From Swiss-Prot:
EC identifiers of the protein: 4.1.99.17
Protein role: Catalyzes the synthesis of the hydroxymethylpyrimidine phosphate (HMP-P) moiety of thiamine from aminoimidazole ribotide (AIR) in a radical S-adenosyl-L-methionine (SAM)-dependent reaction.
Source species: Saccharolobus solfataricus (strain ATCC 35092 / DSM 1617 / JCM 11322 / P2) (Sulfolobus solfataricus)
First-level EC class: lyase
Listed Pfam families: ThiC_Rad_SAM (PF01964)
Reaction equation(s) it catalyzes: 5-amino-1-(5-phospho-beta-D-ribosyl)imidazole + S-adenosyl-L-methionine = 4-amino-2-methyl-5-(phosphooxymethyl)pyrimidine + CO + 5'-deoxyadenosine + formate + L-methionine + 3 H(+)
Keywords, in A-Z order: 4Fe-4S, Iron, Iron-sulfur, Lyase, Metal-binding, S-adenosyl-L-methionine, Thiamine biosynthesis, Zinc
Keyword 4Fe-4S in annotation: yes
Cofactor binding: number and manner: Binds 1 [4Fe-4S] cluster per subunit. The cluster is coordinated with 3 cysteines and an exchangeable S-adenosyl-L-methionine.
Gene Ontology terms, MF aspect: 4 iron, 4 sulfur cluster binding; lyase activity; metal ion binding
Name of the protein in question: Phosphomethylpyrimidine synthase 1
Gene3D superfamilies: Radical SAM ThiC family, central domain (3.20.20.540)
């Protein structure tokens, strides 16, 4: 039985109990929110990952790590090193490979990952069509559906399914004065297929069958945003919002069938529009989990888009976004290295926690309070061991050698905390104060 159906029947399962313990919320609240798809469990029930990853209302914000080859750079060993980074810093992992033996790469990544793995199945069918038929848009509807099924059988836990874009929306977007008509790779593949074949979106045509497949594996449909804004000047235009309205209808039909679903979001969004972007999506979809790419509040940040987008990600998390898709320093410029993947992952781990301090309050802020307490006491071992990256923190703390005094090498003997502790002792021992 699918987890939504278990929840709707009143069952309290071991997974629900584990989510309750992991997140610190009552198990009945977990069950109720799963029944409404306000909490989902990112997993393939037939091939569960090592890490249990619940996403949704009242839970800590999770971080997704994208990796994968390109047709320019095919290096499986490098991608497997990225998996190690994801295992340390991430909650979910997506294989976005477009170069090499895609079946072999996907299976190797799934084997190496401790996290639930997601894919974008249209990539594979489009690329194989391009190689075999000299055109990416020549794949058949059966080939697309077979590829989705193959990914599920391999243990994929969630997939980006670009079902919200219609042929009419695609044509209008391509003819529009948008700064960039379509920036979603998978979305553009679906748009190209619809135009080439003069046919409606194959995902929409076979939506019922897709729901059956995902329900069998109790995997998650991640409804892709093919018309997400790729420039801040395109944010919340008629095409982004039009697709979101279509997506909201698909969400309702998925929930009716007991299929776990989440919605993907932008993209490039000005800072002042990020919070209400989250609220708009939640309102239209009934509060299902929101999986956001950033968003990036500026378009000029590369090669620092991991920093720029982390600002947007923190705001979206605070406003209620549930899963953050990270960006790396290589975003908009090229395939990321292992180091760049780590830099992006850390930036998003920080953004997620910053958002959670607002969204969840005391439940998560006690971590910050502990660190601050030990910092105020100059108890370096206790403080550093609780930081987001203790190893790196210790390297910085000792980069000029062990400090000569109890303070760090920035303030040295003039450390305000050191002086304050001394002043407290003097006040305590003085009868005149």
């Amino acid at each position: 039985m699918a987890i939504i159906e278990e929840a709707r029947s009143g069952q309290i399962t071991d997974e629900m109990k584990e989510i309750s313990k992991l997140e610190g919320i009552p198990v009945e609240k977990v069950r109720n929110r799963i029944s409404e798809c306000k909490i989902i469990l990112i997993r393939n029930a037939k091939y569960p990952s090592k890490k249990l990853v619940p996403i949704g209302k009242g839970l800590t914000t999770k971080v997704n790590i994208n990796i994968g080859t390109s047709d320019e750079v095919v290096n499986l060993q490098m991608e497997l090193e990225k998996v190690k980074v994801a295992n340390r810093w991430g909650d979910t992992l997506m294989d976005l490979s477009t170069g090499g033996d895609l079946d072999d790469i996907r299976r190797e990544i799934i084997r190496a990952s401790e996290l639930p793995v997601g894919t974008v199945p249209v990539y594979q069918v489009f690329i194989e069509s391009f190689k075999k038929k000299s055109g990416g848009a020549y794949f058949t509807e059966d080939e697309l559906l077979s590829t989705v099924e193959k990914h599920l059988k391999d243990g994929v836990a969630f997939m980006t399914i670009h079902a919200g874009i219609t042929k009419e929306l695609a044509i209008r977007a391509l003819k529009s004065n948008r700064i960039i008509p379509i920036v979603s790779r998978g979305g553009d593949m679906i748009a190209g297929w619809m135009i080439h074949n003069n046919s409606e979106n194959p995902y929409r045509k076979h939506w019922g069958y897709l729901l059956e497949m995902f329900k069998e594996y109790d995997a998650v449909i991640s409804l892709g945003d093919a018309l997400r804004p790729g420039a801040t000047g395109d944010a919340h235009d008629e095409f982004q919002v039009g697709e979101l309205l279509e997506t909201a209808r698909l969400v309702k039909s998925a929930l009716k069938e007991g299929v776990q679903v989440m919605v993907e979001g932008p993209g490039h969004v000005p800072l002042n529009e990020i919070a209400w972007d989250v609220k708009l999506m939640k309102k239209l979809t009934g509060g299902v989990p929101y999986y956001v790419l950033g968003p990036l509040p500026i378009d000029v940040g590369a090669p620092y888009d991991h920093i720029a987008s982390a600002i947007g990600a923190a705001i979206s998390s605070a406003a209620g976004a549930d899963l953050l898709c990270y960006l790396t320093p290589a975003e908009h410029l090229g395939l990321p290295t292992v180091k760049q993947v780590e830099e992006g992952a850390i930036a998003y781990r920080i953004a997620a926690h910053a958002g959670d301090v607002v969204k969840l309050g005391r439940r998560v802020r006690k971590w910050d309070d502990e660190v601050s307490y030990y910092r105020g006491k100059l108890e370096w071992d206790n403080m550093i061991s609780r930081l987001i990256d203790p190893q790196r923190a210790y390297q910085v703390y000792t980069q000029f050698g062990i400090p000569k005094v109890k303070a760090c090498t920035m303030c040295g003997g003039y450390c305000p905390m050191m002086w304050a502790m001394d002043q407290v002792r003097k006040i305590g021992s003085s009868s005149s104060l």
